[in-house]
């Protein structure tokens, strides 16, 4: 689950700063340099930019695999064939010398050092072969709906199935897509991937409509508090989306598809209002503190670090106590809401998800759901939190993987929805 917490790693922290290296007005090292930082089983792409402006050379660092751009650096030394920079807030340094046309150096952070060779040129734009290309064979409609309780207006895209539009007399099934934690646009975009766009496109080609929306105060959505907001606030946004779809009187069924925190929100709603079905993509099935302690230990273990975090130790961390969203989440146990959900549920996860551990959460959901032949709980081998085929499941891989979402998952979701009677 892409939780609003700081994952403890030995890698770059996502902090954006700006800094100028005050040096001679030119250097032969001007331009972009890129390479891979190999740390154990993880490979992290780094890009160094040296740009000249107003008699200064500005040096910034990108970490595209982490979604970080423009990390400012402070110059310790810079010449035509060598450089030394640091990012003090991150405890990071890089010292390199030009050798055979490459910057051959050492990257160090928090007492650990690794070789890092950079070659001229920026990294190529990542390939995303599942990205839908226009013109689409289906109709789309820009819509807004209102959460009056929180004074929030949510903007989104209603995607009609192939052969349908708002004038059609036949009523298709529609799915409201609810994103994971953190403010995201309607496509749930991250690292160049647009999972919700890919899902909406696939569903439309299988006869299923969908509505995806920008999270409150994001994209074209306006209003609604963010300060001190919790999943209950975001639940009301999704609830307004369900109401909007039902008021159209254009759909035979109105269901929810939630990813990560969106799966939690789906069960919150499933226990409280009419919902025709739920698809929970890597949604929680256990109490928040239990989930996050397990998440922390899985990430630490995969990173080659000690994995001995207890639930109580997690709860005592400073960032937990100072974050209202996180405080609500660790105290929330979804058991009662899952037990009270009477609609059909398809709960799925990948066995390499290191954010919402599949075995822990799917087993809980399976035991808690009311008995129904329509329910399906499935664990997919080799898939991560985004349902990509992966190596380790660590979040640093997300942007490096070309696949946005497993075709098997897309097919299973569409077939399950279409199989509901």
Segment roles from a protein language model:
Residues 23-99, 104-110, 130, 138, ...:
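Central antiparallel beta-sheet cores of small beta-barrel/beta-sandwich binding domains
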Residues 123-170:
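N-terminal cap/lid segment of alpha/beta-hydrolase-fold proteins
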Residues 164-202:
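Short, surface-exposed "cap/lid" segments of acyl-processing enzymes
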Residues 195, 227-248:
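Alpha/beta-hydrolase active-site loop
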Residues 268-269, 273-340, 355, 371:
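Accessory cap/linker subdomain of secreted extracellular hydrolases
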Residues 341, 347-349:
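Short beta-strand/loop motif that positions the catalytic acidic residue
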Residues 343, 354-368:
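Short alpha-helix in the alpha/beta-hydrolase fold that links the catalytic acid
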Residues 386, 392-421:
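Catalytic active-site module of serine/aspartate enzymes centered on a nucleophile-bearing elbow/loop
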């Amino acid at each position: 689950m892409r939780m609003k917490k700081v994952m403890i790693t030995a890698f770059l922290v996502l902090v954006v700063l700006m800094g100028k290296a005050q040096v001679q007005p030119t250097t032969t090292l001007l331009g972009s340099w890129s390479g891979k930082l190999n740390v154990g089983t993880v490979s992290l792409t780094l890009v160094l930019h040296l740009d000249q402006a107003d008699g200064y050379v500005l040096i910034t660092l990108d970490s595209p695999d982490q979604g970080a751009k423009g990390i400012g650096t402070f110059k310790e030394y810079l010449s035509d064939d060598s450089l030394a920079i640091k990012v003090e807030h991150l405890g990071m340094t890089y010292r390199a010398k030009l050798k055979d046309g490459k910057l051959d150096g050492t990257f160090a952070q928090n007492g650990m050092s690794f070789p890092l060779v950079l070659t001229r040129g920026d990294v190529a734009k990542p390939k995303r072969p599942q990205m839908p290309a226009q013109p689409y064979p289906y109709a789309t409609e820009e819509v807004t709906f209102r959460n009056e309780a929180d004074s929030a207006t949510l903007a989104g895209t209603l995607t009609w199935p192939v052969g349908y539009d708002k004038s059609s007399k036949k009523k298709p099934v529609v799915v409201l897509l609810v994103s994971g934690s953190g403010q995201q646009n309607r496509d749930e975009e991250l690292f160049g991937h647009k999972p919700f766009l890919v899902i909406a496109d696939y569903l439309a080609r299988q006869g299923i409509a969908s509505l995806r929306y920008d999270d409150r105060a994001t994209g074209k959505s306006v209003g609604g508090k963010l300060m001190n907001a919790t999943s209950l606030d975001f639940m009301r946004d999704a609830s307004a989306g369900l109401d909007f779809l039902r008021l159209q009187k254009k759909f035979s069924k109105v269901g929810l598809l939630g990813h990560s925190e969106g799966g939690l929100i789906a069960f919150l709603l499933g226990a409280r209002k009419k919902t025709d079905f739920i698809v929970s993509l890597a949604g929680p099935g256990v109490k928040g503190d239990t989930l996050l302690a397990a998440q922390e230990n899985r990430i630490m273990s995969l990173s080659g670090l000690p994995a001995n975090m207890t639930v109580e130790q997690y709860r005592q961390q400073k960032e937990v106590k100072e974050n209202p969203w996180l405080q609500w989440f660790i105290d929330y146990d979804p058991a009662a809401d899952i037990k009270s959900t009477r609609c059909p549920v398809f709960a799925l996860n990948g066995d390499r998800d290191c954010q919402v551990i599949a075995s822990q959460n799917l087993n809980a959901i399976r035991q808690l759901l009311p008995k129904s032949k329509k329910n399906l709980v499935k664990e997919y081998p080799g898939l991560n939190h985004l349902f990509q085929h992966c190596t380790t499941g660590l979040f640093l891989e997300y942007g490096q993987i070309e696949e946005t979402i497993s075709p098997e998952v897309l097919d299973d979701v569409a077939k399950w929805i279409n199989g509901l009677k």
